[in-house]
Design a protein with these regions (language model features):
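A short acidic, often aromatic-flanked loop/helix-cap motif at beta-alpha or helix-coil junctions
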Residues: 56-61, 78-80, 157-161, 179-181, ...
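RNA substrate-binding interface of SAM-dependent RNA methyltransferases
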Residues: 15, 21, 87-179
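Short beta->alpha connector loops at strand-helix junctions that form conserved
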Residues: 28, 54, 101, 127-128, ...
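Short, hinge-like loop/turn segments at secondary-structure boundaries
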Residues: 42-44, 67-71, 140-145, 189-192
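Active-site/ligand-binding-proximal alpha/beta "capping" segment
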Residues: 172-225
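Structured adenosyl-cofactor binding patch, chiefly the S-adenosyl-L-methionine
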Residues: 19, 140-143, 206-242
Length: 242
């Protein structure tokens, strides 16, 4: 079994079952409790076969990850078409899109998706190449958010930004020398770009950004983790729109 064909952990498994993407459920054979009963009932309701399996076997399936005794074989993750996300934003008054430029850490992507779900982000756009996609680690870290936040995977981010501008979006990037986020005008259609963990936003994408935003800091470090920076800025938009 390929690790990309599974999700694991009670929350990720539950959300995948609710989304009807599960094919077979593997439960740790000595596991008991309310969570087990709930997941069993849900799997039965969704007509998903259940196999009681040893902890060792589950650990082998997940390549040693923390699975909590729950592993679900799933259909391949279905990315959303960019046009579907754009159609969705046309129905929204003030949509917020998140663009991840070359993010490579699955934990960062999972954390960002979890926050995106909490802050009403209309969709997330990631590149097909040189970037992490939706993996079991992403699914577990996101604790089910991948079933609720539309995620598009595109071949060319630069062309995608051109499309977004044609749709009336303002593009914002992150930079140490930008406008402080507390002075950020968050009205209208926003496309927020978060760069690679080490290199930041790529130079060709920077040229297309309308306004750079910075997060004021007063400590000794010069930058924040990508998922933390993304969370702060997503919540800044969310807070201003409450």
């Amino acid at each position: 079994m390929k690790t990309n064909d599974i999700v694991y952990g009670v929350h990720a498994v539950t959300e995948a079952l609710l989304a009807n993407t599960g094919n077979k459920l593997y439960l740790q054979e000595d596991l008991r409790g309310k969570n087990v009963e709930k997941v069993k009932e849900l799997a039965t309701e969704k007509k998903v076969a259940i196999s009681w399996t040893s902890k060792k076997s589950l650990s082998e399936m997940t390549e040693g990850a923390v699975h909590q005794g729950f592993v679900l074989r799933v259909s391949e993750f279905a990315y959303t078409e960019l046009e579907q996300i754009l159609a969705k934003t046309r129905q929204e008054e003030k949509p917020l899109l998140l663009i991840l430029d070359g993010l490579t850490d699955p934990h960062n992507l999972g954390s960002i998706l979890r926050t995106a779900d909490a802050t009403n982000v209309s969709g997330v756009i990631i590149p097909k190449h040189r970037a992490v996609g939706v993996t079991p680690v992403v699914a577990k870290t996101a604790t089910g958010a991948i079933e609720h936040v539309p995620i598009a995977r595109v071949t060319n981010l630069s062309q995608t930004l051109d499309k977004l501008k044609d749709e009336g979006f303002w593009t914002f990037g992150t930079d140490m020398n930008g406008t402080p986020c507390h002075k950020w005008n968050t009205k209208g259609k926003i496309a927020l770009i978060i760069g690679n963990e080490g290199k930041g936003i790529s130079s060709n994408i920077k040229k297309q950004v309308d306004v750079m935003i910075t997060i004021p800091m007063n400590g000794h470090v010069q930058s924040l983790n990508a998922s933390v920076a993304a969370a702060i800025l997503m919540y800044e938009v969310f807070r201003n729109r409450l």
